[in-house]
């Protein structure tokens, strides 16, 4: 649904930028993430070529996206479209029944969002790719499944909304 400007531009908007970078760093890996960051700030990702005083550059978001895509040889525009151009966070919709765990991404713009997800099954942590916005895994009823146990992927978590509702109720008392 639609989000009001009051909801979109609350104090959480600043945290969203940090979480977006946190997710990008996890997705790219440290080496590639810092190469892209150095190139964005200094015009080179080659640290030894930097000499003091180091002059930072003024760049824009699209330049950073272009740097990330070029250095990774992949197109991550889908991620930036959802995280930076939409107020609503992507939601990972899950269901577990009949021996299957089904996961799918839902975004406010109904565009593909192939964000991989780390999932721990009985303590075995693996990263699962999303081919067609949907992932289905076979799991036993007794299996302990934890989705994104280290909170690497920025996404909407319904529990956050419940906490906000409870805070509002307490304020009214």
List the model feature ranges, each with a label:
Residues 3, 8-101:
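Amphipathic alpha-helical substructures
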Residues 12-15, 120, 158:
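Generic detector of intrinsically disordered, low-complexity, polar/charged segments
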Residues 36-39, 115-117, 159-161:
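Composition- and surface-driven signal marking solvent-exposed, interaction-prone regions
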Residues 76-77, 92, 96-152:
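Beta-strand-rich binding/interaction modules
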Residues 149-164:
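Short acidic/polar inter-strand loop motif in beta-rich domains
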Residues 167-169:
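Terminal end segments
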Residues 172-173:
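Compositionally biased low-complexity segments at domain edges in trafficked proteins
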């Amino acid at each position: 649904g639609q989000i009001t400007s009051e909801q979109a531009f609350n104090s959480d908007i600043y945290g969203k930028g940090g979480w977006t970078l946190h997710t990008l760093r996890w997705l790219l890996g440290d080496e590639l993430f810092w190469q892209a960051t150095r190139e964005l700030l200094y015009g080179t990702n080659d640290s030894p070529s930097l000499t003091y005083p180091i002059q930072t550059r003024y760049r824009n978001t699209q330049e950073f996206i272009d740097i990330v895509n070029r250095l990774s040889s992949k197109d991550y525009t889908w991620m930036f479209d959802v995280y930076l151009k939409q107020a609503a966070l992507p939601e990972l919709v899950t269901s577990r029944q009949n021996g299957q765990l089904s996961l799918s991404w839902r975004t406010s713009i109904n565009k593909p969002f192939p964000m991989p997800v780390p999932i721990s099954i009985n303590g075995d942590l693996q990263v699962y790719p999303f081919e067609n916005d949907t992932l289905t895994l076979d799991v036993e009823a007794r299996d302990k499944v934890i989705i994104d146990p280290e909170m690497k992927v920025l996404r909407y978590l319904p529990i956050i909304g419940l906490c906000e509702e409870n805070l509002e109720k307490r304020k009214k008392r």
